[in-house]
Amino acid sequence: AGLTPTVRDVGPFRVSEAGGIAIACGDVFDLEHLDMTGVAGLYDRASLIALPEDMRARYAETLCATLPAGTRGLTITIEYDQALRAGPPFSVGAPEVHARFGTRFAITQLCDDDILSDNPGFVAAGIPWLREHAFSLGIKPTSGMS
């Protein structure tokens, strides 16, 4: 059976809530306007790869600064030779994920898949390889964050 969410505006965010899950839609750089208490999970399918490098740094800093201790996450990125195609989507590999989130989260790479054949736009652009990565962002035992 489907759930019917209650929808409310919280500062610059539209928050939909049902079944104990709340989803806030808005600009991630405005997260300080939300009460993040009780947030337990982060899912990023396309935000990190949609942003140019300077904004990715700010994005990661914002998340690390506003998410409560104990938050876990899943982030999915793609990686290819960025010199062959201007983004977005931008290429974000494992080293960058570790650099951006490693001080806050224990990072485990869950997959590294060849997805070139599933992306005809990249094939048509002459991109020779395209990888999709999924990373678990776990609780860092000695993070000392509260």
Each language-model region and where it sits:
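Class I (Rossmann-like) S-adenosyl-L-methionine-dependent methyltransferase catalytic domain
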Residues: A1-D35, A60-S146
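A conserved hydrophobic position in a structured secondary element of the catalytic/binding core
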Residues: G26, Y43, L51
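A short, conserved alpha-helix within the catalytic core of class I
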Residues: A50-T62
